[in-house]
Amino acid sequence: MTSQIRQNYSTEVEAAVNRLVNLHLRASYTYLSLGFFFDRDDVALEGVGHFFRELAEEKREGAERLLEFQNDRGGRALFQDVQKPSQDEWGKTQEAMEAALAMEKNLNQALLDLHALGSARTDPHLCDFLESHYLDKEVKLIKKMGNHLTNLRRVAGPQPAQTGAPQGSLGEYLFERLTLKHD
């Protein structure tokens, strides 16, 4: 059934919004995996877990905001399968943060591509929506993750030969306590 409210909303933009919803849901799913991995009793980095669980919530809310936009414009939400996270065991905080940063850069590129498509299709409402709700937030999150990675690399220092304890454990613990503390 065709929407009676649809105006200046191309099918290409509609499809791209649906793909972006899926990317947000996949990011949320991945952040849930990360959050609960770091909160396990054998990992016990609650601040890191909390950081990733908050991101899971933000990405889910971002997906819902896109779905509301789709309905407001007369588009149709077409749900796709959400791909499971690439792994179940995430290793050290630095490795997890690197994976999260790569995912955010991919998400940011998808937002930029959608903005460019909106500009090409002369859809100022879409461009304003993305600028108001996503683009600046995404850049700030990428910067924050980059800062966290810099600090994680700094506290990890040079990796000596294995001495029985996992490498970088003290630095990882200090990063979690001093940077991501919550409570």
Swiss-Prot record:
Keywords: Cytoplasm, Cytoplasmic vesicle, Iron, Iron storage, Lysosome, Metal-binding. Disulfide bonds: none annotated. It comes from the Eukaryota. PROSITE patterns: FERRITIN_1, FERRITIN_2, FERRITIN_LIKE. The keyword Cytoplasm applies. The keyword Metal-binding applies. Fe cation binds at E54, E57, E58, E61, E64. Residues 7-156 form the Ferritin-like diiron domain. GO terms for biological process: intracellular iron ion homeostasis; iron ion transport. Oligomer of 24 subunits. There are two types of subunits: L (light) chain and H (heavy) chain. The major chain can be light or heavy, depending on the species and tissue type. The functional molecule forms a roughly spherical shell with a diameter of 12 nm and contains a central cavity into which the insoluble mineral iron core is deposited. Interacts with NCOA4. Stores iron in a soluble, non-toxic, readily available form. Important for iron homeostasis. Iron is taken up in the ferrous form and deposited as ferric hydroxides after oxidation. Also plays a role in delivery of iron to cells. Mediates iron uptake in capsule cells of the developing kidney. Degraded to release iron upon autophagy activation by nutrient starvation. This is Ferritin light chain 1. The lineage of its organism: Eukaryota, Metazoa, Chordata, Craniata, Vertebrata. The gene is Ftl1.
